[in-house]
């Protein structure tokens, strides 16, 4: 699927955007981002009345809208205000934004362990939703096609289908399955802001607000307060998008090793279809005739798999990716959870993404 051919967002999002007369604006952000535009004045749109009303409507429809943050307020408390007052309240937040502390709770996992979940206040959730609505189309235009977590019209089923395609059609039977150690707790804030800047998100006021969100104090169940210097808490409205921004660089690094390698500066590999799109079939044919080693990535949030041809290539990929994550993203892997698997012997354990459904439910705040 080419970037320019990606599906539009879910119908519910489209309905909200159309109702608040924002769809054309969001479509323009996507189109401009595809063309490489730099965005330096996003706060005007983020803090606009229409965007705030749409964010309020979206948060109100979430199952977690009745869950209180540290201030004990829920969407029912904001519902007591008329539209003019809650819009003014959110706009006031943007003028000098300092988020309230995030309440941390432990959500049980099927294996008996727990997952830490950060619950911002209801006002901070609406602020984050306002930012998300504007940043998402800009980032979607930059994201790699085979990243499937927390994105419009993508799911675990799509990730599994892509894995099956690489196995059954491309005959790539070796998988490098890498687990990033405590990914959400170890995101480097400086690197993340730099990645957003390189994506064209260069509104300095907005980037300062996002820094404030990332540094929001965390209140534990025992009353202890943490002041994070890294990480993005699971449970934040903006956290899934930010995690995809961080790992998008990994996606494109892997893609540049084979899948998109011809796109980088060599015109002889490029041939256009009748409609003007790039003929990928022609490029793949040339690649297969070369001495290059095929490698593909399929990613769902921080869970990703690398597909290659044989054992030697797999272990080289394992070592190179581990080093790249450490040097480029300041992230470590979990050796005990990371492995190289021969799918002819162990198919199901390495291709299943069904355990990721837990992420989809707990993040609906």
Residue ranges of predicted features:
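Basic Arg/Gly/Lys-rich low-complexity intrinsically disordered segments
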Residues: 12
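Short, ordered, surface-exposed loop/turn motifs in non-cytosolic proteins
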Residues: 364-365
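N-terminal mitochondrial targeting presequence
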Residues: 1-2
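Conserved small/polar residues in nucleotide/adenosyl-binding loops
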Residues: 354-361
């Amino acid at each position: 699927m080419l970037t320019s051919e990606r599906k539009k967002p879910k119908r519910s999002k489209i309905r909200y955007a159309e109702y608040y007369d924002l769809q054309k604006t969001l479509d323009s952000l996507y189109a401009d981002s595809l063309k490489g535009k730099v965005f330096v004045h996003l706060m005007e749109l983020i803090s606009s009345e229409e965007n705030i009303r749409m964010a309020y409507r979206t948060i109100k429809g979430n199952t977690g809208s009745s869950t209180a943050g540290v201030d004990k307020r829920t969407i029912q408390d904001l519902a007591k205000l008329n539209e003019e007052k809650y819009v003014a309240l959110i706009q006031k937040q943007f003028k000098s934004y300092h988020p309230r502390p995030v309440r941390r709770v432990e959500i049980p996992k099927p294996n008996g362990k727990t997952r830490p979940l950060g619950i911002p206040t209801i006002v901070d959730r609406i602020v984050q939703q306002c930012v998300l609505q504007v940043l998402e189309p800009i980032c979607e235009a930059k994201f790699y096609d085979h990243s499937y977590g927390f994105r419009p019209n993508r799911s675990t089923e799509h990730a599994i289908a892509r894995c099956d395609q690489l196995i059954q059609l491309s005959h790539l039977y070796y998988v490098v399955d890498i687990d990033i150690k405590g990914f959400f707790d170890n995101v480097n804030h400086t690197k993340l802001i730099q990645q957003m800047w390189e994506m064209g998100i260069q509104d300095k006021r907005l980037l300062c607000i996002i820094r404030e969100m990332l540094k929001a104090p965390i209140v534990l169940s025992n009353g202890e307060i943490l002041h994070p210097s890294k990480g993005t808490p699971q449970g934040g409205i903006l956290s899934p998008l930010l995690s995809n921004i961080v790992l998008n660089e990994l996606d494109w690094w892997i893609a540049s090793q084979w899948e998109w390698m011809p796109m980088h500066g060599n015109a002889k590999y490029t041939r256009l279809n009748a409609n003007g799109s790039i003929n990928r079939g022609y490029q793949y044919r040339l690649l297969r005739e070369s001495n290059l080693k095929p490698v593909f990535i399929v990613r769902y949030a921080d869970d990703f798999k690398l597909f290659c041809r044989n054992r030697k290539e797999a272990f080289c990929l394992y070592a190179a990716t581990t080093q790249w994550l450490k040097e480029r993203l300041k992230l470590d892997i979990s050796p005990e959870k990371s492995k190289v698997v021969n799918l002819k012997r162990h198919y199901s354990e390495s291709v299943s993404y069904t355990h990721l459904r837990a992420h989809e439910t707990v993040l609906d705040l």
